[in-house]
């Protein structure tokens, strides 16, 4: 896990590409330094609902495209499997990372695992819709693969742990 470590230039570039492709080119990327700061960022009351809406619109469009290319039952089984496995794996990794930092906040660990499972679902949806490696959800998933936890946009900042 790279959470809490300084951001690599490639991670900053991916984060900037992700938020820009969602329609937020002026949002800056900020590193979140530890689990406690991550909890505060995740619970910020002024998180961007526009960011969430942009992701949701993109998800719906991808799902529509994926359903035009794949049988619905097969697609749903595959997406459920991806989400379930990602949740199982990421929960264990998040728990270990948090414990090493002296954090035992089970709710925060579940949030981190849920975010990873959602990113895996979104990346699988990109594949099912025959999207490319630079689709915003594929880029977001790369951040998770690098051991990062995108915490969303608060104000004019994309928080990356």
Range-by-range predicted roles:
Residues 1-161:
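Short, glycine-biased loop/turn motifs at secondary-structure junctions and
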